[in-house]
């Protein structure tokens, strides 16, 4: 594919382009660290193998000096869009969202992903916005919590659920832990 069409979507980290039959190219902005992209690819392959309803990861590519990932193209509206156009189905959609969330948490996080404790405590020690006593209290509370091994999406909301003919599909795993 030499020339890319107009993007299907533009997010905070990337643009999504049609990329041949049944595929899309998630082309990351140059400011996105390669380590984040590698993590998304590794996590995507892991959760795909775990049987979660996610887009298939095909390959990584470089286009015009930018890193990209070729994914299965997922067709359909987001669950957020469905909520906006069919609000009378809110209870059904809430149950769907809860069921998907439970499915995600039934999977152990892949090796090498940041743990939930590491993620939760990440920026607290350096936060200038928190008073020191509150910062210390939060860190003590987090340290007292049991370690967890469950996969966490990190950005799980109705906008990251695509409703397809084959069922709901969970997208955007960059912030998983």
Model-predicted segments: where are they?
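The N-lobe alphaC helix and its flanking beta3-alphaC-beta4 segment of protein kinase-like domains
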Residues: 35-50
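Short beta-strand micro-motifs within the conserved protein kinase catalytic domain, predominantly
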Residues: 56-67
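Active-site Asp-x-Gly
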Residues: 150, 164-177
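Conserved short submotifs of the Hanks-type protein kinase catalytic core
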Residues: 65-78
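ATP-binding glycine-rich loop module of kinase domains
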Residues: 10-37
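An alpha-helical support segment within catalytic cores of ATP-dependent transferases
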Residues: 106-154, 164-165
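Conserved kinase catalytic-core helix
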Residues: 80-114
